[in-house]
Amino acid sequence: MRHGIAGRKLGVTSSHRQAMFRNMAVALIKHEQITTTLPKAKELRPVAEKLITLGKRGGLHARRQAYAQLRDEVIVTKLFSAIAERYKARQGGYTRVLKAGVRYGDAASMAVIELVDRDVSAKGQDSGPRPERDETEE
């Protein structure tokens, strides 16, 4: 029996789940709105809320905790500057999950998870690979 066990396994291993939520959290902070399956969106919500709370707290320790979770310095900078400033007066409830019908291929229930009061211009930002920094340049 699985009484009192919180969270969904989503059919993947724990390391896969951790990496998936890291990638989804980075995408959510970068684009401020993403489309995914409904169970993944519902599981991503507390992860994103805790990261935004870290951004609001500020300070070096909170920044290191956020970097340990996200592993992307540009996204951590956006989290601690723009997003933290936007939600400084809001006590939680930074994200919303909207149902978005079903996926054509397998009829999976889809959802849009977005930041409340989001920046609409952030939606289509380039998500391609970043150019590698050349270590020989000085």
UniProtKB/Swiss-Prot annotation:
Pfam family, one: Ribosomal_L17
GO cellular component: cytosolic large ribosomal subunit
Domain of life of the native organism: Bacteria
Leader sequence residues: none
InterPro entries listed in its UniProt record: Ribosomal_bL17 (IPR000456), Ribosomal_bL17_CS (IPR047859), Ribosomal_bL17_sf (IPR036373)
One of the GO biological process terms: translation
Keywords: Ribonucleoprotein, Ribosomal protein
MF (Gene Ontology): structural constituent of ribosome
Record PANTHER family: LARGE RIBOSOMAL SUBUNIT PROTEIN BL17M, RIBOSOMAL PROTEIN L17
Subunit relationships: Part of the 50S ribosomal subunit. Contacts protein L32.
Protein family: Belongs to the bacterial ribosomal protein bL17 family.
Name of the protein in its database record: Large ribosomal subunit protein bL17
Species per Swiss-Prot/TrEMBL record: Granulibacter bethesdensis (strain ATCC BAA-1260 / CGDNIH1)
Originating gene: rplQ
